[in-house]
Amino acid sequence: MVDTVFENHPDAEVTFITHLPAEEPDRESLVGNNGKHMVLFPPFPQSQGFHCFHPKLILIRFQDRLRVVISSSNLMEEDWTRWSQCVWMQVAFVSLSHDQDFFSVSEGESKVAEKKLDLEFRTRLIQFLRQCSCPDDRVFNLLRGVCFKGVRVRLVTSVPNVYRKANMNEYGHLRLRTILRSLDEYRASRDIPAQYPPILSLCSSVGTPSANWLHSILASCHGGRAVPEKTALDALVHMVYPTEQCVKESAIGADMAGSLILHSKTYAAKSFPKKCLKRYKNVKGREGSLPHAKYCECSEGV
């Protein structure tokens, strides 16, 4: 797919950032078409633990807007044609040249809030692109003059490293916890009762989720509030996952389903939260497909 993009956009500035194997910590960037086309390989951080480069972020700059796309798909044809995925997209960010009054001095409370969201989104995006080893000139050309007016989302990134103290709240689910805590504080100021709905989660790799880790994720999804006492974990976490039979009967078959990772030893362990698993089922029109989506929802209707 990379070659196809380069071939169809010979005059565009195109940058791909992809991972390297852990045993190959560094590699020279690939540059072509007089510097317009680049493939970059960000190095692994020099810290303990296991790390990988795993974001799926697409930024497309038009003359008058920027399109931001976050998907669960890798840049591989089979990911877009043979797996069930999810895509979030924000389009038509207005160019600053068309909206100078957004940064005018006269503003009310709502406009101040808009500006804060604009600045935060822009800052987080630039910070993340730099952490992905994207050159500053590419970042500047991509975001020059773009005004994120009307953005209604907060950007949460995960950057592998070892963080301590306040830095722990800058990334991953602890940043999510910080954001949602401020929302809970707002609700409390408006006398809106606090709720603790269960989490519905769909993912391709389960790993080895301990009860402590799941409680930590639960707390983050609810702004840091502790799990209600005497509430069973399986009443609060629902992990949707395909069965072995579902994988065998899928369109791609078990041999091609390597993205679905749940080891039998992990499942057999006493500590594994088996009751939290819910059977994945296809809907009409998507028979035989397997999920690669990453989705999480807090909902009373689970």
Q: What is the predicted role of each segment?
A:
Residues M1-V302:
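PLD/PLD-like phosphodiesterase catalytic module centered on the HKD motif
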